[in-house]
């Protein structure tokens, strides 16, 4: 579903399943910040992706592929 967001662009909707501990941490964080749960998730996800843009490092990924003798030669 496409919606306009506060930044003026088109946003996308994502659904996730959270374990109880993660959900409780998220609720406590949103209560402390005064934001909605949705906005808290959006801010935290954006921050994580900025700080860890290459979370699955290509070099490590290649090592795993070679170790498992995968048919994939390149990413």
Curated annotation (Swiss-Prot):
It is found in: Cytoplasm. Pfam families: TraY. GO terms for molecular function: DNA binding. It comes from the Bacteria. Keywords: Activator, Conjugation, Cytoplasm, DNA-binding, Plasmid, Transcription, Transcription regulation. Coiled coil: none annotated. GO terms for cellular component: cytoplasm. Belongs to the TraY family. Part of the relaxosome, a complex composed of plasmid encoded TraI, TraM, TraY and host-encoded IHF bound to the F plasmid origin of transfer (oriT). Interacts with TraM, probably through its C-terminus. Conjugative DNA transfer (CDT) is the unidirectional transfer of ssDNA plasmid from a donor to a recipient cell. It is the central mechanism by which antibiotic resistance and virulence factors are propagated in bacterial populations. Part of the relaxosome, which facilitates a site- and strand-specific cut in the origin of transfer by TraI, at the nic site. Relaxosome formation requires binding of IHF and TraY to the oriT region, which then facilitates binding of TraI. Also positively regulates tra gene expression. This is Relaxosome protein TraY.
């Amino acid at each position: 579903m496409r919606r306009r967001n506060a930044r003026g662009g088109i946003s996308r909707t994502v659904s996730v399943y959270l374990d109880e501990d993660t959900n409780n941490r998220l609720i406590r964080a949103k209560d402390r910040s005064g934001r909605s749960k949705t906005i808290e998730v959006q801010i935290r996800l954006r921050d994580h992706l900025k700080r860890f843009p290459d979370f699955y490092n290509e070099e490590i990924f290649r090592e795993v592929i070679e170790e498992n003798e995968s048919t994939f030669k390149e990413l």
